[in-house]
Amino acid sequence: HSLGADQLYGNLGVVAGQYLKSIVKRGDIIGCVPGRGVAGLVDNMPQLERTGLTVTQLMGSESRREYNLEVDSILHRFARKLSALPQPLYAPVLVSNAELRESIVREPYYQEAYAVMKRCTVAVVGIGTATTYEQYITGANRQPGTAAAGAAAPVGGVHSFQNSFTHR
């Protein structure tokens, strides 16, 4: 019999939490891309007691209702589970023009958050989906009218990192 998506994300979260517990060490900066998989990890991982941890976002937030995954909530719950300091990134993942992007990236708060992102030692990201049919459908084709039309400039994201993440 097949598992429902919630149960599958929960099971993945338990295993990912065990793995994360085995690799995270004192002082790590853990970057995450909050989504359903990371939410499953946060909801199902054990409490972790390490000192000096920071949790930060690796990309901005999507504000459209159909993609809203409560990024702030996931990030802060993740930080609590790790006894870590949260470092949110209050910026959209896409903006409509390059001038707006430049304005955002010049903001001192953004520069501070981005500096933390660049020092990440562990990255927690979801890859694909937990259900078979969804992995073959691109985001623009999931819901009519939800393509990122007019999106001209990404504000911050994993693709802009100069560091390379390696397996420990």
Task: Identify the function of each model-found stretch.
Residues H1-A98:
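N-terminal active-site beta-alpha-beta segment that forms phosphate/nucleotide-binding
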